[in-house]
């Protein structure tokens, strides 16, 4: 039985004070959320301690927005798994389209980050997806399969999450049709060869489309960006009812 993971990625938003206010408004709205799902938030590193305190005794788990594959060293601007574990982090987002784009992250680096996560007891959320140009050229499946094969090499498929995030749908207001997202997620499952693999969809997820997305047979959760920044909006997503 695949347990859906509903994750909100705050990216570079929210101070500690804003995170406290958010949780004060958010937690009461998910008190009666069905227990058949995981609800996760990925704040900036600076807010992890604040979020750990606010989420204590709640159903909300914590994710980091990245992790380095070394335990320590001269890696300016990076963070280690051990540092994250100190704050109660359970998930790590790796391979998101923004680090791939802005910092030229390779599939090999993403694989190192994911392997380290699993070795330390963290669950990597490995992001894959095609650009608008790749989609227009009919290369989407080839690109995603390469990302899967290289990014997931050597990983335990039962201890990770894959997030399919078509880059052209991130922060653009464009949404991949639920049926098409489900088709790609089904392909990913077949390529990995793991029936129980949890696969999320990410890309302009919002309260108005969450129920339809979660009704799809191969979508096991969502990775939410902008719509996770407002507690009312993300609470509605976390409380989805598949139609």
Curated annotation (Swiss-Prot):
Catalytic activity field: D-glyceraldehyde 3-phosphate = dihydroxyacetone phosphate
Gene Ontology molecular function, alphabetical: triose-phosphate isomerase activity
Entry's EC annotation: 5.3.1.1
Family that this chain belongs to: Belongs to the triosephosphate isomerase family.
Gene transcribed to yield this protein: tpiA
Name the record gives this protein: Triosephosphate isomerase
Enzyme class: isomerase
NCBIfam families attached to this UniProt entry: tim
Gene3D superfamilies per UniProt: Aldolase class I
Compartment(s) where it occurs, according to its Swiss-Prot or TrEMBL record: Cytoplasm
PANTHER family according to UniProt: TRIOSEPHOSPHATE ISOMERASE
GO cellular component: cytosol
Classification via HAMAP family: TIM_B (MF_00147_B)
């Amino acid at each position: 039985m695949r347990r859906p993971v509903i994750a909100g990625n705050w990216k570079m938003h929210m101070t500690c004070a804003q995170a406290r206010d958010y949780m004060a408004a958010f937690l009461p709205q998910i008190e009666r959320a069905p227990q058949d799902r995981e609800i996760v938030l990925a704040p900036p590193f600076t807010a992890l301690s604040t979020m750990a305190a606010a989420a204590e005794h709640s159903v909300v788990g914590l994710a980091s927005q990245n992790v380095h594959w070394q335990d320590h060293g001269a890696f300016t601007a990076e963070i280690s798994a051990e540092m994250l574990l100190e704050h109660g982090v359970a998930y790590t987002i790796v391979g998101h389209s923004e680090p791939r784009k802005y910092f030229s992250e390779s599939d090999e680096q993403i694989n190192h980050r994911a392997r380290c996560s699993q070795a330390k007891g963290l669950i990597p959320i490995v992001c894959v997806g095609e650009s608008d140009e790749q989609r227009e050229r009919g290369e989407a499946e080839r690109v995603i399969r390469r990302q899967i094969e290289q990014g997931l090499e050597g990983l335990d498929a039962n201890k990770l999450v894959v997030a399919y995030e078509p880059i052209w749908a991130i922060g653009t207001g464009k949404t991949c049709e639920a049926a098409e997202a489900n088709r790609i997620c089904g392909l990913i499952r077949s390529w990995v060869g793991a029936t129980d693999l949890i696969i999320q969809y990410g890309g302009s997820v919002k309260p108005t489309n969450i129920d339809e997305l979660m009704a799809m047979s191969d979508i096991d959760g969502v990775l939410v960006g902008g719509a996770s920044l407002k507690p009312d909006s993300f609470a509605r997503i976390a409380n989805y009812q598949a139609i």
